[in-house]
Amino acid sequence: MKYILPVLLFPMKRILLFLLLLGIFKASIAQISSDSLEYRIRPDSLKTGELQLSFQNFNFMRNYEYFNKIQDGYTLFGTQLEPQLVYFAHPRLVITTGLHLQKDFGATGIYRTLPLVSLKYKNGNTTLINGVLEGNIHHRMAEPLFDFEKRITEPVEYGTQFMIENKSLFLDAFINWKRMIYKPSPVQEQILGGLSVDYKLIKNSSVQLSIPLQLTAFHQGGQIDIAPEPLQTLVNTAIGFKLKIPLSGFVNSLRTENYLMGFNDFSFTDVQAFSKGHGWYLNTGFDTHFGSLMGTYWKGMSFISSNGMPLYQGVSQHIEHAGFTEKNRKLLMLRYSYQKQLIPNLFLDFRFEPFMDMGRPAGNRKIEFSNSSFLVYRQSFKLLKPRVDR
């Protein structure tokens, strides 16, 4: 299809290697900003030799009042705790080790416990990470490609990540090894490669303009499994532009973020309902001291995303309607968000996102919505100072 962005037809492992070697773009923040939810630990030449205790507590409530056939209605309510030991081994190297724990309210015991181990090397504007990635929301991908909810449901990603960060350029290229297998495995391995890019063309006091480029490549297969399912290789792409106009007064800024998205199934065997598709993801809104308001329009045609929010897709993940297809999706959303630092190290993030399915007959259209609140506390404590040789 002429609207689909071209994707190199390399074997999957070459695609993933290609993502790591790319170094010419920058990641983008799509739709609602999640800056207050990001947490990055990096090497620091002023802390060389120090041992710190890093503490992050992420409290979440995300509720979906959905009554459609594509995405379920449900509530995620709980807390995550991540204590980590952070050793600044060298001006360019930091090593971290710790635990991720998740407690879901209303459930018995700890829902999930995962190890956190990472090595981060930073040289100038480039960073190489191995182990636990700066994942999910840190990739800054648009929701149709990468579901925001994965901050809760898949909070820890393991693999390798390469980043470039400067005033006009930020690149996030990563391999997330989702499932490892051992011979003979009853299930297939799963790998997700990604590239999230945003190149700033103009940035001054009167206007900011940038070009985002995003790509995910999901592979499920392997050569040492005995699973009967055929291998799958699904690729999603996005390209667009972001424009922000700073203002003074009640409205701080006007902004628009718009994307053309593509889907291609490069599997040898047809498993998905559609082999290719595309979608338009259009966002326009404004920011004030009392929060941000944004209108969103989505038009998807045969669109599937391996990691995106189910609502935007043409194939249902609903518990009662799994496999139901809706080739053409038209959604109209109004999205309010409010982020604030309450006290040092404590951040609040609130979101209210009603939408209407414009693909339904006029008399059957209903307003559905999701609402979210996040309370995040993060702090670092010095445990060991660097030894000074006399």
Model regions and ranges:
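Surface-exposed coil loops of outer-membrane beta-barrel proteins
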Residues: 127-198
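Membrane-embedded beta-strand positions of outer-membrane beta-barrel proteins
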Residues: 51-57, 97, 128-130, 162, ...
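Outer membrane beta-barrel transmembrane domains
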Residues: 139-144, 270-275, 285, 289-355
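Transmembrane beta-strands of outer-membrane beta-barrel pores
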Residues: 55-63, 99-105, 123, 132-137, ...
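Outer-membrane beta-barrel "beta-signal"
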Residues: 367-390
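Short loop/turn motifs that connect adjacent beta-strands in outer-membrane beta-barrel proteins
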Residues: 32-50, 90-92, 125, 200-212, ...
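Residues on the lipid-exposed face of transmembrane beta-strands in outer-membrane beta-barrel proteins
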Residues: 81-87, 117-121, 160-164, 195-199, ...
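Residues that define the transmembrane beta-barrel architecture of outer-membrane proteins
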Residues: 75-81, 109-115, 154-158, 187-193, ...
